[in-house]
């Protein structure tokens, strides 16, 4: 089984980034969206109407710097409750802004929350993947996508995803220098790559090999049914 899940991060960060994510959903280029529920621009209605699967994009940066220990657990609980208030349900999956959810001092409260609500968690490397699976948490087999703007917007693994569930992390958006994001230009590049890929797919070019597109929830449901 080869499955590709395309996840757009940072919904709620900035209005023009929200627009880019919604545009990517409309063109059929995104399956899942990670929402930043503590941000003032996390408006639920357009995302709910889009039909995309919605997860929680956890933030552990407080006013005075990174949170850990009891403050981190409190921050996660508050964000989980806020997600429920906004979207009327639990998140379908969990991941973290700048992969904060994978930091050793923060991984445990994230795993405990995932266990509580029955949600998969994004794994950022093989060690993190093994750690989650040892605790019974579903996680994709591979994460692709760039963390820095100098990396290629179209990952080479996309042409031939390996067996299992591959998650492609993207940050589509329309540029806006007022956002304050150091990744501003790269968001426009990500959106352009998604547009290009969907155009190629429209003409039956095998842009992701023989992988099947899916949401995370559906991918793990099928995996369970087949095992």
Named regions from a protein language model:
Residues 1-6, 15-59, 64-93, 105-227:
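Terminal accessory/targeting
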Residues 95-98:
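Active-site histidine-anchored catalytic micro-motif
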Residues 101-103:
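Active-site pocket-lining segments that scaffold enzyme catalytic pockets across diverse folds
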